[in-house]
C-alpha cells in the first residue's frame, strides 16, 4: 500500500486541485518544505512560488501560486491561495501559454529578483522534462 496524502488547492475562484498524492513541496515564507503522509500538523504562510506535486505514479505536476496559507495534518494538506495557475497542458502551445501566465502571476506578486530567478528556473526546468 502506498502512503498517500490528500491535497486540496483552493483559490477565490474555486478548487484548483484535489487528489491523493505521494508528496508535495510548498513555497513557505521561510523557505520550501516538503510534506509526506504522517507529517506533523502545522499552519504555514506561503509566498509566491511553485507547488511541486508528486503523484502516486511518481509523475510531477506544478502549480504556480501567489501568496497563501497551508494547513497540514497527518493525512491532508489544504492550500488556500490568492491565485493559481496550473503549469501543464495537452500540447506544447497550451503549456507555453500556462507557463507565461504562471510567470506573470509570480512576477506581479514579488519584487525579489533572486526569488523570481529561482522560481522561473524551476518552471523552465519542469517544462523540459
Swiss-Prot record:
Subcellular location: Cell inner membrane
Any Pfam family hit: ATP-synt_DE_N
Taxonomic superkingdom: Bacteria
Binding partners and assembly: F-type ATPases have 2 components, CF(1) - the catalytic core - and CF(0) - the membrane proton channel. CF(1) has five subunits: alpha(3), beta(3), gamma(1), delta(1), epsilon(1). CF(0) has three main subunits: a, b and c.
HAMAP family, per the entry: ATP_synth_epsil_bac
Family: Belongs to the ATPase epsilon chain family.
Protein name (record): ATP synthase epsilon chain
